[in-house]
Amino acid sequence: MTALLIDGNALSKTLRAQAAERAAALTARGHQPGLAVILVGANPASEVYVRNKIKACEDNGFFSLKDAYPDTLSEADLLARIDELNRDPKIHGILVQLPLPKHIDSHKVIEAIAPEKDVDGFHIANAGALMTGKPLFRPCTPYGVMKMFEAHDIPLQGANAVVIGRSNIVGKPMAMMLLDAGATVTICHSKTRDLAAHTRQADIVVAAVGKRNILTADMVKPGATVIDVGMNRDDAGKLCGDVDFAGVKEVASHITPVPGGVGPMTITMLLINTIEAAERAADAAA
């Protein structure tokens, strides 16, 4: 059996077309959705991510603003800029590209973003709202994964799901969303004693640790759905995920590729979150 590929590019195209329609409707009402992206320093990967986010905005009728600063920017100046954007009615979403330079406290920066403009869903108010089943914004990567399950009719209710990784950005919110959908969820991480014992029982495995080949074919239950959130480089410098794709695709029923899987969905859900923020702001102003 060869797994069915869950194509993130194709699903993104459909969802972005829907986002563009909603953006056009809002713009016609005088409320073009606006996203501000802040980049501090010259991290090459961060520069690529920011460029892709700005391009996605431009391609789908969003207003976008990119603030790029040297890594010498002070924390106080960054917080002051966020305060300005919080009060700017043209901006509905604010995203600070992580990681930040060491002298800037990323937790403090995230908490400075107004919760109603926190389209990454990282603010403590939004994390708490997700935890209690009343999310304002869902973090973009796990939200994109949930859309993939939905598009491919992958049953979650009663399913055994293993999430490998416990970050605030992917692992923890992913587990909460699966739990809300009725799955029985196990979170595994670097201190987990026998990872394979957990993954072999799983109907769904989400790998999100940033470690190549953490999941191999012998660790996967036949017919499982495998979602690869990892972004790594192989020995030849080629982009790859956390999953041994060649081996696992012969065992799983569904699998996401890297690249072209979860990556494009993350930016798509950023657009969806920004649209939702803009729609709420427009309704409040009406």
UniProtKB/Swiss-Prot annotation:
Q: Gene3D superfamilies, per this entry?
A: Leucine Dehydrogenase, chain A, domain 1 (3.40.50.10860), NAD(P)-binding Rossmann-like Domain (3.40.50.720)
Please state the Enzyme Commission number of this protein: 1.5.1.5, 3.5.4.9
Q: Identify the pathway.
A: One-carbon metabolism; tetrahydrofolate interconversion
> In the UniProt record, does the keyword Kinase occur?
no
Q: Where does NADP(+) bind?
A: G165, R166, S167, S190
GO molecular function (one) = methenyltetrahydrofolate cyclohydrolase activity
Q: Name one GO biological process term.
A: purine nucleotide biosynthetic process
Any one cellular-component term (Gene Ontology): cytosol
Q: Keyword NADP: yes or no?
A: yes
Q: Which InterPro entries match?
A: Aminoacid_DH-like_N_sf, NAD(P)-bd_dom_sf, THF_DH/CycHdrlase, THF_DH/CycHdrlase_cat_dom, THF_DH/CycHdrlase_CS, THF_DH/CycHdrlase_NAD-bd_dom
Q: Which reaction does it catalyse?
A: (6R)-5,10-methylene-5,6,7,8-tetrahydrofolate + NADP(+) = (6R)-5,10-methenyltetrahydrofolate + NADPH; (6R)-5,10-methenyltetrahydrofolate + H2O = (6R)-10-formyltetrahydrofolate + H(+)
UniProt KW keywords: Amino-acid biosynthesis, Histidine biosynthesis, Hydrolase, Methionine biosynthesis, Multifunctional enzyme, NADP, One-carbon metabolism, Oxidoreductase, Purine biosynthesis
State the family it belongs to: Belongs to the tetrahydrofolate dehydrogenase/cyclohydrolase family.
Function, as annotated: Catalyzes the oxidation of 5,10-methylenetetrahydrofolate to 5,10-methenyltetrahydrofolate and then the hydrolysis of 5,10-methenyltetrahydrofolate to 10-formyltetrahydrofolate.
Subunit organization:
Homodimer.
NCBIfam families per the UniProt record, alphabetical = PRK10792.1, PRK14186.1, PRK14189.1
Recorded protein name is Bifunctional protein FolD
Origin organism is: Burkholderia lata (strain ATCC 17760 / DSM 23089 / LMG 22485 / NCIMB 9086 / R18194 / 383)
